[in-house]
Amino acid sequence: MRNLKKMKQFLTLNDLPNFDAQVALAKEIKANPYQFEKVGKRKTLGLLFFNPSLRTRLSTQKAGRLLGMDVMVMNFSNEAWAIEYEDGTIMEGLRSEHVKEAAQVVSQYCDIVGIRAFATLTDKEKDEEEQVLQKFIEHAKVPILNMES
């Protein structure tokens, strides 16, 4: 895409290099949605949902396809093992996948990964840490897109 700096992560609007230019580009894309369909050719967008979603899921899948990307979606509430986020934890019982390995596996199959994970609303300090998002950023080898906060 024209004159856009490559970014490693897109976590907040503050990550955009020039917000006004991005808004103008969004309007241009809205008017001609397929103009960048070759940008994502031979690229895969992985979408990891740790919570239910309607608009975010549909709009992000559509955006990926408009960019020519293959899109893979995984719902962790019912399609995957529960993930452990704490280092040094023994993997047993319900948590049989550590985020470190999960992020590395996802990185092998995807060129960019979108993550949607709600706050738990049980521990304010942990919620502010955004543990799911931050652990994937730490361990993934591909750019991460925050689809929640």
Where are these regions (language model features)?
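Positively charged, low-complexity intrinsically disordered leader regions
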Residues: 2-58, 62
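Short charge-dense sequence patches
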Residues: 5-17, 83-85, 104, 108-118
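Catalytic cores of large soluble enzymes that bind and process phosphate-bearing ligands
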Residues: 11-18, 52, 91-94, 98, ...
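Structural signal for conserved beta-strand scaffold positions within catalytic alpha/beta enzyme cores
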Residues: 12, 47, 73, 144-146
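Solvent-exposed, non-transmembrane amphipathic alpha-helical segments
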Residues: 39, 65, 84, 123-126
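Active-site cofactor/substrate anionic-group-binding motifs, chiefly glycine-
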Residues: 44, 49-108
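Anion-binding alpha/beta catalytic cores of soluble intermediary-metabolism enzymes, centered on
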Residues: 95-107, 111-149
